[in-house]
Amino acid sequence: MNSRLTTFAVVLTACSHVLAETDNPMSLAEGRVVLGIELQTRFEFRDNNFDFNSAAGTINDDSWLLNRLRLNVKVQPTPWMTFFAEGQDSQEIGSQRPDRPGALGAEGDNTFDLRQAWFELGDVKSFPLTLKAGRQVLLYGDQRLIGPLDWNNISRTFDAAKLRWHGRDGLWVDLFTSSVVVPDRGGFDESNWNSVFSGLYAHIPTLELQDTELYVLHLRDTNLGHAFFTFGTHLKSQPEALGSWDYEAEFAVQTGRAGGRDLRAFASYVEGGYTFDHPWKPRVGLEYSYGTGDGNPADGDQGAFQNLFPTNHLHYGLIDAFSWSNLHDVALHLSVKPMAKLTTSLEFHVFWLDDTADTWRRANAATPVRAANPAASNYAGSELDLTVAYTVCDSFRVMAGYSHFFAGDYLAATGASSDADFLYLMTNLKF
């Protein structure tokens, strides 16, 4: 009871500061030192999400609570120098799954560890180059290839060095090299420099119509036998540039070596939407996503698109059964804002595998849902996702969602084919 009252008091205090439009209470030394805190709690219920088999109850057919606490400090002694450090504690409570992150699908426990620690040098008002080095978040485009995976309770960061050139009118170009940080429940989270991820990424506003992004990415992983390039472009219309219409698209090709095999792969998505002139701002969108699969796992060629370091939860259904590889996904998006602080959305996805000779991989782009079966139908199933988000104040949000997966012919031909359900309720306090 006391903990609930304490939480309520913290939320009330945070919101009252915003409503009163006071200065940031976490800002010290005339803004040169800023403290931050984020507390996120998510209740989840999952049934048949991993095996699509209602006849065999597993430790993943259960409910649990995910807690995440982040504490950070930002210090800016001069306009051209910034330091930032952030610690994170992640816990999975009430689950029978292993405590180790990733084991049997578990979010796992990762007791207070260093999530970010970086410094940034440069003042764009004086010189157009800045350098950011240390443990940091990398996020580009709509996170289909590079993102922090923030839905995951531990999330993702990189030990990286990033040089950015700042041009005019929102133009910028990044050059970076990095290694992803691997969570270690029993010790300090560290990166593995046997895996090096580098890239050149440019953001180019175009004729006040769209944002155009061009990139060249390279992943070298000596443990996995990877050494390949990803060349691509991401396009997104600017707000109201086309009136009520909007669009977004991305195209990427890969070449090199993946898993010791010659890689030739492709991925793309195209989305268009229309927002009606109504106080609730209803939007209807249609999206198609495609990632190549591998037609013959036994030969020396690899045709499956390598999904790199994405946040796939945002794109291919909330149950997280798919990645941007060996995939056809047609999705209908509906959203409305009945109130300024309330957003509701409904999505319906229909999924096919690109090639049934290849594995169906989950959202982490690695874990197989089922072994390949070339003789099976490529229709995997469909998914309905309903989400509701309410912003109590700038510092506090409440979100809830329900998803149902309708099992398709591929599941029926390869084993159990029960439908799956996912339900969550999440709160996020941040200031």
Where are the regions a protein language model picked out?
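Structural signature of outer-membrane beta-barrel domains
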Residues: 42-46, 82, 86, 90-94, ...
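Transmembrane beta-strand segments of Gram-negative outer membrane beta-barrel proteins
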Residues: 24-54, 82-85, 171, 210, ...
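Outer-membrane beta-barrel biogenesis signature
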Residues: 15-39, 45, 58, 298-301, ...
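Signature for the C-terminal beta-barrel architecture of outer-membrane proteins
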Residues: 127-131, 148-298, 337, 350, ...
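Cleavable N-terminal export/targeting peptides
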Residues: 1-23
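Outer-membrane beta-barrel "beta-signal"
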Residues: 386, 418-431
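Outer-membrane beta-barrel transmembrane domain signature
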Residues: 325-329, 333-385, 391, 405, ...
